[in-house]
C-alpha cells in the first residue's frame, strides 16, 4: 500500500471527515515520526510496533553488477519491529493458508 491508497481507504471508511483533513493528518503523523527518528528517538505504537535507528558499521561491500569491491560508510538505518499483536494477527491469517 502506498500513501495515496492509505488516504483513499481512510476516506472511504470515514466519509464524514473531509479528504483534505485526512490527507493533512496522515502527512503530519508521518512527518512527526520522521522528525522524531532524525533526533534519534524511538517511536512505539502499542499493538503495532516500534521504529528505531540501527547502526551499521563501515564495511567493504561488492557491486553486484560489476563484482568490484566498494567501501560502504558507517550509517544509521531506520528499523521497524512489529509488536506482538501485529505478529499474532499476521501469523493467524497465514496459518490458515
Curated annotation (Swiss-Prot):
Listed SUPFAM superfamilies: IHF-like DNA-binding proteins (SSF47729)
Q: Can you name one GO molecular function term for this protein?
A: DNA binding
Q: Which InterPro entries match?
A: Hist_DNA-bd (IPR000119), Histone-like_DNA-bd_CS (IPR020816), IHF-like_DNA-bd_dom_sf (IPR010992), IHF_beta (IPR005685)
Pfam families attached to this UniProt entry: Bac_DNA_binding
Which Gene Ontology terms of cellular component type are present? Answer: chromosome; cytosol
Its Gene Ontology biological processes? DNA recombination; regulation of DNA-templated transcription; regulation of translation
Entry's SMART domains? BHL
Q: Which UniProt keywords apply?
A: DNA recombination, DNA-binding, Transcription, Transcription regulation, Translation regulation
Q: Which residues cross the membrane?
A: none
What CDD domains does the entry give?
Answer: IHF_B (cd13836)
Stored HAMAP family: IHF_beta
Family assignment? Belongs to the bacterial histone-like protein family.
The record's function comment reads: This protein is one of the two subunits of integration host factor, a specific DNA-binding protein that functions in genetic recombination as well as in transcriptional and translational control.
Q: How does it assemble?
A: Heterodimer of an alpha and a beta chain.
This protein's name:
Integration host factor subunit beta
Natural source organism: Buchnera aphidicola subsp. Cinara cedri (strain Cc)
The gene behind this protein is ihfB
Amino acid at each position: 500500500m502506498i500513501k495515496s491508497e492509505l488516504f483513499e481507504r481512510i476516506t472511504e471508511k470515514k466519509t464524514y471527515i473531509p479528504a483534505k483533513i485526512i490527507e493533512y493528518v496522515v502527512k503530519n503523523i508521518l512527518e512527526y515520526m520522521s522528525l522524531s527518528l532524525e533526533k534519534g528517538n524511538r517511536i512505539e505504537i502499542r499493538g503495532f510496533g516500534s521504529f528505531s535507528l540501527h547502526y551499521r558499521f563501515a564495511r567493504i561491500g561488492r557491486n553486484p553488477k560489476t563484482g568490484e569491491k566498494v567501501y560502504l560508510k558507517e550509517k544509521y538505518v531506520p528499523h521497524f519491529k512489529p509488536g506482538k499483536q501485529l505478529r499474532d494477527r499476521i501469523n493467524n491469517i497465514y496459518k490458515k493458508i
